[in-house]
Structure formats: structure tokens, C-alpha cells
Amino acid sequence: MRAIILGATGAIGKDLVQELINDDTIEQIAIFVRRDPGINNEKVTTHIVDFDQSDKWRLSVQGDVVFSCIGTTRKAAGSKDNQYKIDYTYQYNFAKIAAEQGVPSFVLVSAAMANANSPFFYTKMKGELEEAIKQLPFQHISILRPPALIRKNTTRNSEKLSVSILQFFNQIGLLKSQRPMKTEVVAHCMVELAKTKKSGVFEPKDIFKIGER
């Protein structure tokens, strides 16, 4: 299988790259990034691109599956508009190009409670992206909605707080369906869904079931 990764420098993306490198069924890994992550492996081809200039890289989008796990915060992006551009526009445009290039499968990391009709900016944006991706002519589309993530060496204080709160409630028997999830569990689930060509929307309980095998 020839894999394409969008978001290889993020927490899930880093685990995904390693998962694919260690998998003997994966022949090639093409990553599309804005900066060089310094990955030195014979399977990996790094494309350093400007996502606003797709005419320069669109023909390089060749493979069997796209793994899309781009994600940022409003603080990191600098504004709502920039966050939308990174989280929605870049991912949708890449997916559209992949479909045009004949890539048959697309695996998207969305977010828990994503809903295009949500009154909240983040979950609405993620829901809108899901709906847009579903309209593209892929043979298989897998959408993952992970809960709060446990990232290695995270510096996001809000994320640390949300994980701590969820872990507290989990300890007293509440919100079990939203217990925090390690990024490597998400990465493993993504690979398994690509291999089995399972389409659908996968909620936290589904991701745990598949990703912890």
C-alpha cells in the first residue's frame, strides 16, 4: 500500500509515520508538509509545499490512501480565519485533488461532537469538513472522531486541563465514552481502517476498540 500523509508533523501524524514505517505492508509513504520534519527512512518521500500553490504539487499526490490529520488551535493559528484555513481549507483542497488524482481511500481525523450545525466554531468547522469530504468521489472514506488526546510532551495548557478533568470524571465512573485517548491509538486505528477499507464515522468507543487491538 502507498500511503499519503497530511499533517505528519503533528502529534498524531508523528505516531502515524512511525506506525507506517514499521508496517511491512506499506511500500511507500509520501508526506506533504510546510517544513522538513527530518525523517530519514527509505520508505518516506517528503514534499515541502505551499498549500496555497497546489498547481506546484498536485501531480505528486499519488497513492492508495490519504491519511489527513491536520489540526491546530486558534492560539497557534493566530485567528479564527487562519485556523479555518488550516483545519478546513487546506484539508478539503488536498482531498479534492487526491480524488481527482484517483486516490481511492481517504482517512480523516475529525473531532468528537463534530457537527455542521453546531453553534460552536470548532465543532461546526469539523462537521462542515466531514460533510464536504463525504461529497468527494472516494471509494472508501473513514472519519475518526477522537476525544481529548493524550499527546507526548504537550505544551497546550488547555489540553492538559481537559485531559485531567476527563480523567477525574472517569475515575468516579462518569463520561467513560469520552475518556482521553493516546495519539498512538488514533494512529493505529487509522492504519487498520485503511487496510480493511472500512467506511463510516468512528466515534471514540470505535477508535478504542480498533486502535487498542
Where are the language model's segments positioned?
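Conserved Rossmann-fold NAD(P)-dependent oxidoreductase catalytic core, especially the SDR/UDP-sugar
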Residues: K80, K85-E130, Q135, S142-L144
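NAD(P)H-binding glycine-rich loop region in Rossmannoid oxidoreductase-like domains
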Residues: I4, G38, V44-N93, I97-E100
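N-terminal Rossmann NAD(P)H-binding glycine-rich loop of SDR-like oxidoreductase domains
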Residues: R2-D23
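Oxidoreductase cofactor-interface core, primarily capturing Rossmann-like NAD(P)-dependent enzymes
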Residues: N22, E27, A116-R213
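Short, polar loop motifs at secondary-structure junctions
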Residues: A30-G38
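SDR active-site strand-loop-helix element
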Residues: L6, F32, C69-I70, F106-A112, ...
